[in-house]
Amino acid sequence: MARRNKARKRKISPDSRYDSVLLMRFINVIMKYGKKSVAEKIVYNALSSAEKEVNERGVSIFETAVENVTPSVEVRSRRIGGATYQVPVEVKKDRAVSLALRWIVKSASAMRKKSGKGFFKCLCSEILDAYNKRGGAFKMCEEKYKMAEANKAFSHLRF
């Protein structure tokens, strides 16, 4: 065990346009090589095009999409007596949200590689898919839930 103090959690300031901490976390997930302004442009363009399609505020579309993709349970490997079991465990809220954000970005980039469209268009369509409870990120969430459901018998082996 580490003898140092626990690592402090960083405070994330809300973004300038929508005043949302969740959106700033998403921008930080998208950001590559420290280019935050590029990531902000991508996210804001995707949200503005999503606003035009749904006729709702962009940040509320995004929050609903993240809520739909957020997992409630996941499986963790636990080794007992030479056998490894997949034990279903509840996900902490902070981890669940960060998983949802990563899944949205991952499925949007996979869509970009397949289709060859710009990233913000793929991100927009992935956010709308998550908003409507379909798409790659929602499928990842469903797979986590199914895996936990299949291994429900090992839930007594909790950590």
Curated annotation (Swiss-Prot):
GO cellular component, one term: small ribosomal subunit
rRNA-binding as UniProt keyword: yes
Record carries keyword rRNA-binding: yes
UniProt xrefs under InterPro entries: Ribosomal_uS7, Ribosomal_uS7_bac/org-type, Ribosomal_uS7_CS, Ribosomal_uS7_dom, Ribosomal_uS7_dom_sf
GO biological process: translation
Disulphide connectivity of cysteines: none
Subunit and interaction comment: Part of the 30S ribosomal subunit. Contacts proteins S9 and S11.
Family under the similarity heading: Belongs to the universal ribosomal protein uS7 family.
Name under which the protein is recorded: Small ribosomal subunit protein uS7
Organism: Wolbachia sp. subsp. Brugia malayi (strain TRS)
Gene name tied to this protein: rpsG
